[in-house]
Swiss-Prot record:
Residues 158-208 form the DHHC domain. This is Protein S-acyltransferase 18. PANTHER family: PROTEIN S-ACYLTRANSFERASE 18, ZINC FINGER DHHC DOMAIN CONTAINING PROTEIN. Disulfide bonds: none annotated. The chain crosses the membrane at residues 17-37, 42-62, 203-223, 250-270. Its main location: endoplasmic reticulum. Residues 443-468 are annotated as: Disordered.
């Protein structure tokens, strides 16, 4: 699956197209049936001006929020920084040398003047003018990372095994977009894009202007509906003058009341979603934290109440695949489910396997996470964040050891230096959960892939014999020191198995 960069990248989501169609219908209905039938010229001009500006803002913010790429680019920035550091150092060396030479001659000139001319104003301790320091300015710059590295930046870096890249700790992996999003909040289907740190402000502004647009159109439709019964003659004359056809008033009244109901429903849904995000901002939380907190609360409802999360047990549970947000009846208008039968979110942090406990939780009847701002208001932010952290910690403990994680290990330092890794296209490997088979590689005997994953054998046998199998007791969750020890032991076993001529020997 390719990584998505923005929401306009194909394939487009159906809800994205539906949203554009609804917007076009609302704008066309306002200019054709509502805006010009208020009966007051000043009110018509003012209303058309306000609605036009709001409608243009909505489409601009929608395009911008969908086109923004919220991907975490920490790894790419580091690579660009490393490449540009050499060029900057060359330029800086030239500047430093030129300043050293200039200051040397200036100091020599001052010394000669002090010794022969005896000018007191040239003495640095008697002069009010502060002389330049001995060290050149580029060598003492505070913003240079090579001189004063920022320890907080290094502490904030994590590693995503799915992307195989270094990302920030606040970044999460979205399965729908197949990328890590910086400051991940949620994946919006109406935008066909993830909402994160880079486009969250645009998303909030988009909700505000959409809410204003719905309120203006709903109020105008209600005014036109009332006027159809209060001023029938004036409305009939204005219909002929504006539409140039005989348009019945009952049809206009029907269209108006439909627009009133539709905009009222949309305004309620949008208002609920906007209030939900306002409360999230006030509490310093994200939608993803809210989901994890609700799942944590549901999991320990029968064991410990939510008020006693400090004493909750560390029972193994999988939070890799949180369920999709199941909105309430009102909030279905925004970010609702595309398929009611699915109960998994479109986000995946790491791994595809689920533990038995998580399967039981997901199949638990009535278990869902809804967008409920009223429940969020009564929720303590400290306890919610604590529950979210516990869920994340449980996720790290229960992520699968085999499969994705094993294939996504970063190369060891020695492998990086000496080029021990082999092209994965030429690798014929048979992996088993408890045993690893010795299979001949279709390459020269002198080059091998990572010893942690595969061995080279003879070309005569494609099916390994029982003697060729050996136990693998390597724990992939060890520390970096244990990983180095694992690599050393693997290389020792490899040297004992492989002879110099490339033939196969039984492991000792």
């Amino acid at each position: 699956m390719t990584r998505r960069r923005h929401g306009w990248q194909r394939p487009l989501h159906p809800l994205q197209i539906v949203g554009a169609v609804i917007y076009s219908v609302l704008v066309a209905a306002f200019y054709v049936f509502l805006g010009f039938f208020l009966g007051n010229r000043i009110a018509v001009i003012a209303l058309l001006s306000v609605f036009s500006s709001v409608a243009v803002s909505v489409i601009v913010l929608f395009v911008r929020c969908t086109a923004i790429d919220p991907t975490d680019k920490t790894s790419a920035k580091k690579k660009r920084k490393d490449k540009s550091k050499g060029v900057l150092m060359k330029l800086r060396v030239k500047v430093v040398l030129s300043q050293v030479v200039v200051r040397f001659f200036r100091r020599l000139e001052r010394k000669i003047l002090r010794n022969f001319l005896r000018r007191t104003y040239l003495d640095p301790w008697k002069s009010s003018v502060q002389l330049e320091p001995l060290l050149p300015f580029p060598l003492v710059m505070k913003d240079d990372d090579s001189v004063t590295p920022d320890p907080k930046e290094e502490d904030d870096i994590s590693y995503c095994s799915l992307c195989d890249l270094e990302v920030k700790r606040s970044s999460k992996h979205c399965r729908t977009c197949n990328r890590c999003v910086e400051g991940f909040d949620h994946h919006c289907r109406w935008l066909n894009n993830c909402v994160g740190k880079k486009n969250y402000t645009t998303f909030i502004l988009l909700m505000v202007f959409v809410l204003l647009m719905l309120i203006i159109e709903g109020g105008t439709a209600l005014a036109v509906f009332v006027r159809c019964f209060v001023d029938k003659k004036g409305m009939e004359m204005e219909l002929k003058r504006r539409l140039y056809v005989e348009f019945p008033q009952w049809a206009l009244a029907t269209i108006s009341i439909i627009l009133v109901l539709f905009t009222a429903y949309g305004s309620a849904a949008m208002g609920q979603l906007f209030l939900f995000h306002v409360v999230l901002i006030r509490k310093g939380m994200r939608t993803y934290d809210y989901i994890l907190a609700m799942k944590e609360e549901n999991q320990f409802t029968e064991v410990d109440p939510f008020d006693e999360l400090d004493s909750s047990s560390d029972e193994s549970s999988d939070f890799d695949s949180p369920e999709r947000l199941r909105p309430t009846f009102i909030s279905k208008f925004m970010c609702r489910k595309a398929n009611e039968n699915q109960q998994r979110l479109s986000i995946k942090i790491e791994g595809d396997e689920q533990s038995p406990s998580s399967t039981l939780i997901n199949k638990k009847p009535g278990f869902h996470v809804s967008i409920n701002p009223w429940k969020l208001i009564t929720l303590s932010s400290e306890k919610a964040l604590q529950a979210a952290e516990k869920a994340k910690e449980r996720l790290r403990k229960t992520k699968p050891v085999s499969g994705t994680e094993e294939n996504s290990l970063k190369p060891l330092p020695l492998e990086t230096k000496f080029g021990l890794l082999l092209d994965p296209d030429n690798n014929n490997t048979v992996l088993q959960p408890s045993t690893t088979a010795a299979v001949k590689l279709q390459v020269s005997p002198g080059r091998f892939s990572s010893p942690r994953r595969r061995f080279s054998g003879s070309s005569s046998s494609t099916v390994p014999s029982p003697k060729q199998k050996y136990r693998t007791n390597f724990d992939l969750k060890l520390t970096e020191v244990s990983r180095e020890l694992e690599s050393y032991i693997s290389r020792q076993v490899l040297c004992s198995v492989i002879k110099q001529d490339g033939s196969e020997a039984s492991p000792r």
